[in-house]
Amino acid sequence: KGISLDVEKGQVISIIGPSGSGKSTLLRSMNFLEKPNKGKITFDNTEFEVEKMTKKDILDIRKYTTMVFQNYNLFKNKTALNNIIEGLLVVKKMNKEEAEKIGLELLKKVGLEEKRDFYPSQMSGGQQQRIAIARSLAMNPKVILLDEPTSALDPELVGEVLKVIKDIASEHVTMVIVTHEMQFAKEISDKVVFMDNGIIIEEGTPLQLFENPQNNRTKEFLKRYIQRS
């Protein structure tokens, strides 16, 4: 099945659709956590043919993209601050003082300055996800990929994570988000993509997709969502 998706600089794109529709697979294939079978990826005017990509090509793409996972994926034996700066020290070879300065600024940005020396086990799920988002920002990526960032959270913790993502979006950071939070997708996105059965069924602005969907499958999905909420 073929998929074609354009992401412009500074855009926030939300990918919605039923479970098992291929949303996360599409997201993970953007930075080669899952390798696409064939096709082309164009990044910053550089075109890559998937079948011919070398390890260096894949590393180059990963340098400019960061991923925020459902289950945070923090290092359990590192503090909040050390989780954030790990990539700066190991990948970017930054000196510790400079890395910590960036890390502390990002802790402030996600509202967790007081948690700098806390370990993941001492923090709530919402706090851990905010640290994971700060870690992804530390690498100064060109694109942040977020895979259902609130799906593992207790309902009362969802809001704090969505607020952080909204704040980042307001700074025109390019983001692609897989989400089941429809109201959030409606508010934050420049473009919403509806997927089902491994293909893109419909895409458009939030107004187009939520208020005036053209495809019957999109209408059916959104109708169920409205009934549930």
Give the positions of each predicted feature.
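ABC family nucleotide-binding domain
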Residues: 1-206
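C-terminal boundary and immediately downstream tail of ABC-type ATPase nucleotide-binding domains
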Residues: 203, 207-229
